[in-house]
Amino acid sequence: MKLITILLLCSRLLPSLAQEEGAQEMDCNDETVFQAVDTALKKYNAELESGNQFLLYRVTEGTKKDGAETLYSFKYQIKEGNCSVQSGLTWQDCDFKDAEEAATGECTTTLGKKENKFSVATQICNITPGKGPKKTEEDLCVGCFQPIPMDSSDLKPVLKHAVEHFNNNTKHTHLFALTEVKSAHSQVVAGMNYKIIYSIVQTNCSKEDFPFLREDCVPLPYGDHGECRGHTYVDIHNTIAGFSQSCDLYPGDDLFSLLPKKCFGCPKNIPVDSPELKEALGHSIAQLNAQHNHLFYFKIDTVKKATSQVVAGTKYVIEFIARETNCSKQTNTELTADCETKHLGQSLNCNANVYMRPWENKVVPTVRCQALDMMISRPPGFSPFRLVQVQETKEGTTRLLNSCEYKGRLSKAGAGPAPDHQAEASTVTP
Protein backbone atom coordinates (compact mmCIF):
# COMPACT_ATOMS: atom_id res chain seq x y z
CA MET A 1 0.00 0.00 0.00
CA LYS A 2 1.33 3.40 -0.87
CA LEU A 3 0.89 6.13 1.70
CA ILE A 4 -0.14 9.44 0.18
CA THR A 5 -1.11 12.78 1.50
CA ILE A 6 -4.40 11.42 2.81
CA LEU A 7 -2.38 10.38 5.88
CA LEU A 8 -2.06 14.01 6.80
CA LEU A 9 -5.01 13.98 9.16
CA CYS A 10 -4.80 17.12 11.24
CA SER A 11 -6.19 16.71 14.73
CA ARG A 12 -5.45 20.29 15.66
CA LEU A 13 -3.56 23.34 14.44
CA LEU A 14 -0.73 25.02 16.24
CA PRO A 15 -2.04 26.84 19.33
CA SER A 16 1.31 27.07 21.07
CA LEU A 17 3.85 27.65 18.31
CA ALA A 18 1.52 30.10 16.61
CA GLN A 19 1.99 32.46 19.51
CA GLU A 20 5.47 33.18 18.22
CA GLU A 21 5.57 36.60 16.62
CA GLY A 22 5.09 36.42 12.86
CA ALA A 23 4.21 32.70 12.81
CA GLN A 24 1.31 31.66 10.57
CA GLU A 25 -0.83 28.57 11.01
CA MET A 26 -0.76 26.16 8.06
CA ASP A 27 -3.71 24.39 6.53
CA CYS A 28 -3.55 20.60 6.39
CA ASN A 29 -4.41 20.65 2.69
CA ASP A 30 -1.29 22.69 1.90
CA GLU A 31 1.01 20.46 -0.15
CA THR A 32 3.97 22.17 1.52
CA VAL A 33 3.02 20.46 4.78
CA PHE A 34 3.48 17.02 3.25
CA GLN A 35 6.73 17.97 1.52
CA ALA A 36 8.25 19.32 4.72
CA VAL A 37 7.18 16.42 6.95
CA ASP A 38 8.28 13.94 4.27
CA THR A 39 11.77 15.48 4.38
CA ALA A 40 11.88 15.27 8.18
CA LEU A 41 10.65 11.66 8.34
CA LYS A 42 13.04 10.47 5.65
CA LYS A 43 15.89 12.02 7.61
CA TYR A 44 14.78 10.26 10.79
CA ASN A 45 14.52 6.87 9.04
CA ALA A 46 17.89 7.37 7.39
CA GLU A 47 19.55 7.70 10.79
CA LEU A 48 18.13 4.44 12.15
CA GLU A 49 20.76 1.70 12.40
CA SER A 50 18.44 -1.28 12.67
CA GLY A 51 14.79 -2.32 12.83
CA ASN A 52 11.96 -1.05 10.65
CA GLN A 53 11.21 2.32 9.15
CA PHE A 54 8.52 4.56 10.59
CA LEU A 55 5.53 5.75 8.57
CA LEU A 56 3.63 9.01 8.81
CA TYR A 57 0.36 8.65 10.70
CA ARG A 58 -0.85 12.18 11.43
CA VAL A 59 0.37 15.79 11.36
CA THR A 60 -0.97 17.51 14.47
CA GLU A 61 0.57 20.99 14.40
CA GLY A 62 2.15 23.24 11.79
CA THR A 63 3.27 26.86 11.39
CA LYS A 64 5.58 28.86 9.17
CA LYS A 65 7.46 32.10 9.68
CA ASP A 66 8.58 34.16 6.69
CA GLY A 67 11.94 35.91 6.55
CA ALA A 68 15.25 35.70 4.71
CA GLU A 69 14.73 31.97 5.16
CA THR A 70 11.21 30.63 5.71
CA LEU A 71 11.02 28.55 8.89
CA TYR A 72 8.54 25.72 9.37
CA SER A 73 7.62 24.02 12.65
CA PHE A 74 5.65 20.77 12.88
CA LYS A 75 4.51 18.09 15.25
CA TYR A 76 3.66 14.76 13.67
CA GLN A 77 2.87 11.21 14.77
CA ILE A 78 4.49 8.09 13.34
CA LYS A 79 3.95 4.32 13.45
CA GLU A 80 6.31 1.45 12.75
CA GLY A 81 6.08 -0.07 9.28
CA ASN A 82 6.95 -3.49 7.87
CA CYS A 83 9.98 -2.35 5.81
CA SER A 84 13.45 -2.62 7.34
CA VAL A 85 15.78 0.36 7.34
CA GLN A 86 18.11 -1.59 5.00
CA SER A 87 15.37 -2.40 2.46
CA GLY A 88 16.14 0.58 0.23
CA LEU A 89 12.44 1.48 0.13
CA THR A 90 10.96 4.81 1.11
CA TRP A 91 8.38 4.94 3.88
CA GLN A 92 5.60 5.54 1.32
CA ASP A 93 6.25 2.05 -0.11
CA CYS A 94 5.63 0.31 3.23
CA ASP A 95 2.58 -0.83 5.18
CA PHE A 96 1.84 -0.30 8.84
CA LYS A 97 2.99 -3.11 11.10
CA ASP A 98 0.36 -4.92 13.18
CA ALA A 99 -1.04 -2.34 15.60
CA GLU A 100 -0.28 -4.33 18.76
CA GLU A 101 3.34 -5.02 17.82
CA ALA A 102 4.12 -1.67 16.18
CA ALA A 103 6.12 1.03 17.92
CA THR A 104 4.63 4.52 17.82
CA GLY A 105 6.05 7.98 18.32
CA GLU A 106 5.68 11.74 18.08
CA CYS A 107 8.22 14.06 16.48
CA THR A 108 8.80 17.80 16.83
CA THR A 109 10.79 19.33 13.99
CA THR A 110 11.90 22.69 12.62
CA LEU A 111 12.88 23.09 8.97
CA GLY A 112 14.28 25.85 6.82
CA LYS A 113 13.55 26.37 3.15
CA LYS A 114 15.90 27.91 0.62
CA GLU A 115 15.46 27.76 -3.13
CA ASN A 116 12.46 25.44 -2.72
CA LYS A 117 14.54 22.90 -0.81
CA PHE A 118 13.77 21.87 2.77
CA SER A 119 16.48 21.22 5.34
CA VAL A 120 15.88 19.91 8.85
CA ALA A 121 17.22 22.25 11.50
CA THR A 122 16.06 20.41 14.63
CA GLN A 123 14.14 17.23 15.26
CA ILE A 124 13.27 15.28 18.39
CA CYS A 125 11.27 12.03 18.25
CA ASN A 126 9.94 10.21 21.31
CA ILE A 127 9.30 6.53 20.53
CA THR A 128 7.07 4.13 22.48
CA PRO A 129 8.02 0.46 21.85
CA GLY A 130 5.34 -1.95 20.68
CA LYS A 131 4.30 -5.17 22.42
CA GLY A 132 6.01 -7.50 20.00
CA PRO A 133 7.27 -11.00 20.88
CA LYS A 134 10.40 -11.15 23.03
CA LYS A 135 13.64 -12.03 21.30
CA THR A 136 15.36 -15.28 22.17
CA GLU A 137 19.07 -16.05 21.98
CA GLU A 138 18.49 -17.63 18.58
CA ASP A 139 17.06 -14.35 17.31
CA LEU A 140 20.18 -12.37 18.21
CA CYS A 141 22.80 -11.85 15.52
CA VAL A 142 26.16 -12.88 16.92
CA GLY A 143 28.87 -10.51 15.66
CA CYS A 144 26.39 -7.87 14.49
CA PHE A 145 26.15 -4.32 15.76
CA GLN A 146 23.84 -4.14 18.77
CA PRO A 147 22.42 -1.00 20.41
CA ILE A 148 23.92 -0.08 23.77
CA PRO A 149 22.78 2.45 26.40
CA MET A 150 23.81 5.96 25.43
CA ASP A 151 25.01 6.60 28.98
CA SER A 152 27.20 3.47 29.04
CA SER A 153 30.53 3.94 30.81
CA ASP A 154 32.20 2.13 27.89
CA LEU A 155 31.38 5.13 25.70
CA LYS A 156 33.09 7.75 27.86
CA PRO A 157 36.65 7.26 26.51
CA VAL A 158 35.29 6.82 22.98
CA LEU A 159 33.34 10.09 23.12
CA LYS A 160 36.23 11.92 24.79
CA HIS A 161 38.54 10.81 21.98
CA ALA A 162 35.97 11.79 19.34
CA VAL A 163 35.47 15.33 20.66
CA GLU A 164 39.23 15.84 21.10
CA HIS A 165 39.80 14.63 17.55
CA PHE A 166 37.23 17.12 16.25
CA ASN A 167 38.76 20.02 18.18
CA ASN A 168 42.31 19.11 17.10
CA ASN A 169 41.50 18.62 13.42
CA THR A 170 39.23 21.53 12.56
CA LYS A 171 40.10 25.15 11.84
CA HIS A 172 37.30 26.56 13.96
CA THR A 173 38.44 29.34 16.30
CA HIS A 174 36.69 27.85 19.34
CA LEU A 175 36.55 24.52 21.11
CA PHE A 176 33.42 22.39 20.92
CA ALA A 177 31.81 20.30 23.65
CA LEU A 178 29.57 17.25 23.58
CA THR A 179 25.87 18.03 23.98
CA GLU A 180 24.03 14.78 23.33
CA VAL A 181 24.61 11.16 22.34
CA LYS A 182 21.89 10.34 19.83
CA SER A 183 22.77 6.74 18.95
CA ALA A 184 25.30 4.14 20.09
CA HIS A 185 26.02 0.61 18.84
CA SER A 186 28.79 -1.89 19.56
CA GLN A 187 30.09 -4.94 17.74
CA VAL A 188 32.25 -7.73 19.18
CA VAL A 189 35.25 -8.47 16.95
CA ALA A 190 38.89 -9.02 17.96
CA GLY A 191 38.26 -6.18 20.33
CA MET A 192 35.23 -3.92 19.96
CA ASN A 193 33.79 -1.69 17.25
CA TYR A 194 31.64 1.29 18.20
CA LYS A 195 29.33 3.38 16.05
CA ILE A 196 28.08 6.60 17.58
CA ILE A 197 26.04 9.61 16.53
CA TYR A 198 26.45 12.66 18.72
CA SER A 199 25.91 16.41 18.64
CA ILE A 200 28.39 19.13 19.56
CA VAL A 201 28.16 22.84 20.30
CA GLN A 202 30.60 25.73 20.25
CA THR A 203 31.86 26.87 23.66
CA ASN A 204 33.14 30.24 24.80
CA CYS A 205 36.72 28.87 24.99
CA SER A 206 38.82 29.99 22.03
CA LYS A 207 41.70 27.81 20.85
CA GLU A 208 43.97 30.82 21.17
CA ASP A 209 43.35 31.06 24.91
CA PHE A 210 42.60 27.43 25.78
CA PRO A 211 44.75 24.59 24.40
CA PHE A 212 42.18 21.99 25.46
CA LEU A 213 38.58 21.75 26.63
CA ARG A 214 38.10 22.55 30.32
CA GLU A 215 35.25 22.14 32.76
CA ASP A 216 34.61 25.88 32.85
CA CYS A 217 34.17 26.13 29.08
CA VAL A 218 30.52 27.13 28.66
CA PRO A 219 28.42 26.00 25.65
CA LEU A 220 27.09 29.00 23.73
CA PRO A 221 23.32 28.74 23.17
CA TYR A 222 23.69 30.80 19.99
CA GLY A 223 26.99 29.32 18.84
CA ASP A 224 27.76 26.97 15.99
CA HIS A 225 26.33 23.45 16.18
CA GLY A 226 27.29 20.18 14.60
CA GLU A 227 26.39 16.53 14.39
CA CYS A 228 28.94 13.76 14.00
CA ARG A 229 28.93 10.08 13.08
CA GLY A 230 31.96 8.21 14.38
CA HIS A 231 33.44 4.72 14.02
CA THR A 232 35.92 3.58 16.68
CA TYR A 233 37.87 0.35 16.99
CA VAL A 234 39.19 -0.60 20.45
CA ASP A 235 41.66 -3.49 20.27
CA ILE A 236 42.15 -6.34 22.75
CA HIS A 237 44.65 -4.20 24.67
CA ASN A 238 41.91 -1.66 25.39
CA THR A 239 43.54 0.90 23.09
CA ILE A 240 41.80 3.01 20.47
CA ALA A 241 43.53 1.67 17.37
CA GLY A 242 41.15 2.81 14.62
CA PHE A 243 38.99 5.90 14.36
CA SER A 244 37.09 7.84 11.73
CA GLN A 245 34.25 10.30 11.83
CA SER A 246 32.37 12.75 9.66
CA CYS A 247 30.76 15.89 11.01
CA ASP A 248 28.31 18.38 9.58
CA LEU A 249 28.91 21.81 11.09
CA TYR A 250 26.33 24.57 10.86
CA PRO A 251 27.08 28.23 11.61
CA GLY A 252 24.96 30.07 14.12
CA ASP A 253 24.01 32.80 11.67
CA ASP A 254 21.04 31.46 9.73
CA LEU A 255 18.26 30.88 12.24
CA PHE A 256 16.71 32.41 15.32
CA SER A 257 17.96 35.31 17.46
CA LEU A 258 21.20 37.16 17.96
CA LEU A 259 23.73 36.22 20.58
CA PRO A 260 24.02 38.88 23.33
CA LYS A 261 27.19 40.91 23.03
CA LYS A 262 28.21 39.94 26.55
CA CYS A 263 28.36 36.34 27.65
CA PHE A 264 27.38 36.50 31.29
CA GLY A 265 29.05 33.85 33.41
CA CYS A 266 31.77 33.18 30.82
CA PRO A 267 35.48 33.57 31.61
CA LYS A 268 36.82 36.95 30.47
CA ASN A 269 40.40 38.04 29.91
CA ILE A 270 41.70 40.68 32.29
CA PRO A 271 44.93 42.73 32.03
CA VAL A 272 47.90 41.02 33.64
CA ASP A 273 48.69 44.21 35.57
CA SER A 274 45.12 44.71 36.79
CA PRO A 275 44.78 45.65 40.50
CA GLU A 276 41.93 43.14 40.56
CA LEU A 277 44.53 40.36 40.47
CA LYS A 278 46.47 41.50 43.54
CA GLU A 279 44.57 39.45 46.10
CA ALA A 280 44.29 36.37 43.89
CA LEU A 281 48.03 36.47 43.16
CA GLY A 282 48.76 36.78 46.86
CA HIS A 283 46.75 33.64 47.60
CA SER A 284 48.42 31.86 44.67
CA ILE A 285 52.01 32.47 45.75
CA ALA A 286 51.16 31.69 49.37
CA GLN A 287 49.70 28.35 48.28
CA LEU A 288 52.73 27.65 46.08
CA ASN A 289 55.19 28.26 48.91
CA ALA A 290 53.09 26.22 51.33
CA GLN A 291 52.95 23.14 49.13
CA HIS A 292 56.45 23.39 47.61
CA ASN A 293 59.18 21.74 49.69
CA HIS A 294 61.96 23.98 48.35
CA LEU A 295 64.28 25.51 50.97
CA PHE A 296 63.69 29.04 49.68
CA TYR A 297 60.54 31.05 49.03
CA PHE A 298 59.34 31.81 45.53
CA LYS A 299 57.79 35.06 44.36
CA ILE A 300 55.84 35.91 41.22
CA ASP A 301 58.08 37.32 38.52
CA THR A 302 55.73 37.60 35.52
CA VAL A 303 52.00 37.17 35.00
CA LYS A 304 51.48 35.70 31.55
CA LYS A 305 47.70 35.46 31.30
CA ALA A 306 44.64 35.84 33.53
CA THR A 307 40.89 35.37 33.33
CA SER A 308 38.05 35.92 35.77
CA GLN A 309 34.66 34.26 35.83
CA VAL A 310 31.60 35.16 37.87
CA VAL A 311 30.19 32.01 39.47
CA ALA A 312 28.86 31.82 43.05
CA GLY A 313 31.67 34.25 43.77
CA THR A 314 34.62 34.89 41.46
CA LYS A 315 36.97 32.36 39.92
CA TYR A 316 40.39 33.50 38.72
CA VAL A 317 42.54 31.44 36.36
CA ILE A 318 46.10 32.78 36.23
CA GLU A 319 49.25 31.65 34.46
CA PHE A 320 52.45 33.08 35.89
CA ILE A 321 56.18 32.50 36.29
CA ALA A 322 57.60 32.28 39.81
CA ARG A 323 61.29 32.60 40.65
CA GLU A 324 63.30 31.50 43.64
CA THR A 325 64.21 34.25 46.12
CA ASN A 326 67.06 34.72 48.59
CA CYS A 327 64.71 34.28 51.58
CA SER A 328 65.05 30.83 53.12
CA LYS A 329 62.16 29.23 54.94
CA GLN A 330 64.44 28.46 57.89
CA THR A 331 65.13 32.11 58.70
CA ASN A 332 61.90 33.70 57.41
CA THR A 333 58.39 32.86 58.50
CA GLU A 334 56.83 34.24 55.32
CA LEU A 335 57.58 35.86 51.99
CA THR A 336 58.08 39.62 52.32
CA ALA A 337 58.60 42.50 49.92
CA ASP A 338 62.31 42.54 50.84
CA CYS A 339 62.85 39.09 49.34
CA GLU A 340 64.67 39.41 46.02
CA THR A 341 64.85 36.86 43.22
CA LYS A 342 68.11 35.01 42.66
CA HIS A 343 69.82 35.69 39.37
CA LEU A 344 70.42 31.98 38.76
CA GLY A 345 67.59 30.68 40.93
CA GLN A 346 65.03 28.11 39.91
CA SER A 347 62.03 29.23 37.84
CA LEU A 348 58.58 27.66 37.73
CA ASN A 349 55.78 27.99 35.21
CA CYS A 350 52.54 27.90 37.23
CA ASN A 351 48.82 27.69 36.62
CA ALA A 352 46.56 28.80 39.46
CA ASN A 353 42.82 28.58 40.06
CA VAL A 354 41.58 30.85 42.84
CA TYR A 355 37.95 30.65 43.92
CA MET A 356 36.86 33.56 46.14
CA ARG A 357 33.62 34.26 48.02
CA PRO A 358 34.34 37.53 49.88
CA TRP A 359 31.06 37.61 51.81
CA GLU A 360 32.04 34.31 53.45
CA ASN A 361 35.78 35.09 53.70
CA LYS A 362 36.26 31.92 51.67
CA VAL A 363 39.28 31.44 49.41
CA VAL A 364 40.18 28.13 47.72
CA PRO A 365 43.45 28.33 45.76
CA THR A 366 44.97 25.48 43.75
CA VAL A 367 48.37 25.84 42.08
CA ARG A 368 50.24 23.51 39.74
CA CYS A 369 53.79 24.30 38.64
CA GLN A 370 56.44 22.89 36.36
CA ALA A 371 60.15 23.70 36.36
CA LEU A 372 61.44 25.85 33.51
CA ASP A 373 64.49 23.85 32.47
CA MET A 374 64.99 26.12 29.46
CA MET A 375 66.11 28.89 31.81
CA ILE A 376 69.41 27.13 32.49
CA SER A 377 70.69 27.60 28.95
CA ARG A 378 69.42 31.11 28.20
CA PRO A 379 71.99 33.42 26.54
CA PRO A 380 73.45 36.33 28.55
CA GLY A 381 71.14 39.32 28.78
CA PHE A 382 68.18 37.39 27.40
CA SER A 383 64.99 37.36 29.42
CA PRO A 384 61.95 35.56 28.09
CA PHE A 385 59.89 37.55 30.58
CA ARG A 386 60.30 40.65 28.42
CA LEU A 387 58.73 38.84 25.50
CA VAL A 388 55.42 38.18 27.22
CA GLN A 389 52.66 40.04 25.47
CA VAL A 390 49.17 40.81 26.71
CA GLN A 391 46.55 39.45 24.34
CA GLU A 392 43.42 41.52 23.93
CA THR A 393 40.10 40.15 22.80
CA LYS A 394 37.53 42.05 20.82
CA GLU A 395 34.08 42.26 22.30
CA GLY A 396 30.81 42.86 20.53
CA THR A 397 30.87 39.81 18.25
CA THR A 398 27.39 38.51 17.57
CA ARG A 399 26.39 35.08 16.33
CA LEU A 400 23.14 33.52 15.26
CA LEU A 401 21.70 30.14 16.19
CA ASN A 402 21.25 27.37 13.67
CA SER A 403 20.60 23.87 14.86
CA CYS A 404 22.41 21.14 13.04
CA GLU A 405 21.30 19.06 10.09
CA TYR A 406 22.76 15.58 9.76
CA LYS A 407 23.37 14.34 6.25
CA GLY A 408 25.22 11.12 6.99
CA ARG A 409 24.72 7.85 5.14
CA LEU A 410 24.24 4.46 6.72
CA SER A 411 27.38 2.45 7.21
CA LYS A 412 27.46 -1.27 6.62
CA ALA A 413 28.33 -3.53 9.54
CA GLY A 414 31.69 -5.20 9.18
CA ALA A 415 33.68 -7.81 10.99
CA GLY A 416 36.78 -5.69 11.51
CA PRO A 417 37.86 -2.21 12.48
CA ALA A 418 36.78 0.82 10.50
CA PRO A 419 39.39 1.28 7.75
CA ASP A 420 38.87 4.96 6.86
CA HIS A 421 41.43 6.65 9.05
CA GLN A 422 43.85 5.56 11.71
CA ALA A 423 43.95 7.83 14.70
CA GLU A 424 46.87 8.14 17.01
CA ALA A 425 46.81 5.35 19.60
CA SER A 426 45.41 6.31 22.97
CA THR A 427 44.74 4.07 25.93
CA VAL A 428 41.12 3.78 26.99
CA THR A 429 40.66 4.82 30.60
CA PRO A 430 37.04 4.91 31.82
UniProtKB/Swiss-Prot annotation:
**Tissues/organs with expression:** Plasma.
Induction conditions:
In response to an inflammatory stimulant. T-kininogen II synthesis is induced and the plasma concentration of T-kininogen I is raised.
Miscellaneous comment as given in the Swiss-Prot or TrEMBL entry: Rats express four types of kininogens: the classical HMW and LMW kininogens produced by alternative splicing of the same gene, and two additional LMW-like kininogens: T-I and T-II.
Which named protein is this? T-kininogen 2
Disordered: annotated segments: 410-430
SUPFAM superfamilies registered for this protein in UniProt: Cystatin/monellin
Residue span of the signal peptide, if any? 1-18
Which positions are tagged coiled coil?
Answer: none
Indicate which residues are glycosylated according to the record: N82, N168, N204, N326
Q: Could you tell me which cysteines form disulfide bridges? A: C28-C404, C83-C94, C107-C125, C141-C144, C205-C217, C228-C247, C263-C266, C327-C339, C350-C369
